[in-house]
Amino acid sequence: AFVPRNDQFTLLAADYSQIELRIIASISEDPGMLEAFNNGLDIHTATASRVYGIEIDEVSKDQRRNAKTVNFGIVYGISAFGLSERLNIPRGEAADIIKAYFEKYPGVRNYMDETRAFAREHGYVETLLGRRRYLKDINSRNGTVRSFAERNAINAPIQGSSADMIKIAMINIHQKLRELKLR
């Protein structure tokens, strides 16, 4: 655990709530995902409601947990096999959940398809601030190697943009602390 050096110092902890999912909602421009965030809904509960076709107040803890796994897993290219292993459900059920997810959040699917196509053509992807991640294996003939590069193509703009935003916030906080002569 971190502790302040002495009584003259205080530790500051800050967190952006669901930053990566907010970024994917923004860059994919998916209406359903944007609506959930804009209305202050819990994105995992909203996803469970959409995927399972039930009202938000009917979502169980297990359904929310499953939706949370799907929300984060989709960004990292989770397969039906991987989802079935994580959720301990049959592979067919996992495939149905992934299919329903993309039906309810088509903007996310479009983002993924367009990002892979861009990466194949240009050999890189970018964060929202233009920082590039080069993907030398994006056109590999080896399917396993290519799939890994494709997953990186999809998640690098999301994770990288998140990192960019957090670093900017840290710089702004540091400047404000110096300005106010705080330690």
Spans of model-derived segments:
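Conserved catalytic core of nucleotide polymerization and phosphodiester-bond processing enzymes
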Residues: 1-183
